[in-house]
Amino acid sequence: MKRILSIAVVPRPTSVIEAPGTFRLTARTPIVICDEQLRRPAEIFADAIAALTGFVPTITTVNAPAAIVLHLIPGYKPEEYRLVATRKGVDLTASTPQAILHGLRTLQQLVSAQGIPACTIEDRPCFAYRGAMLDVSRHFFPVEEVKTYIDLLSLHKINRFHWHLTDDQGWRIEIKRYP
């Protein structure tokens, strides 16, 4: 009989080891980036946390206690990451900014009013190509709806977006130069 984990993340990670305790995410919790390449993934995560909690975490390159620390370390497979959450903070390691973003999307799903559960998560995709399509040739979608769709793809670690723009003479993108 399989043990049911209290940690629910979509898609299901390769490995989840639960531990006792939680890390309290507060307005003073910084996101420490150990490489400037990680600034954009950190900004995306900070925006998501702001939407969930109402406060925007600061992004810094200076080590700090009780922080979310992002490390680029060679040796991981493409898009593979390791996330370790303890009572004292969160460490996320991977070899690419894309893999760090995947780890941050997992961390985003772990955030709750009770805090971030202590755990170790190791994950990598089973398939290199994970895609989804949006067909705007048959139905109109407002720009904000398309952006929300892309954000949801990112949250679920989908790495290819197929945007079906047209089936025939109908063109759904405004081009100022041509009528």
Where are the predicted features?
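Conserved strand-to-helix beginnings and helix N-cap segments that scaffold or border functional pockets
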Residues: 42-43, 143-147
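Aromatic- and acidic-residue-enriched carbohydrate-binding clefts of CAZyme catalytic domains
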Residues: 169-179
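Contiguous, structured surface segment used for ligand recognition
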Residues: 1-130
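Residue-level signal for secondary-structure boundary sites
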Residues: 39, 100, 140-142, 171
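A mature extracytoplasmic/lumenal domain signature
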Residues: 37, 138, 165-167
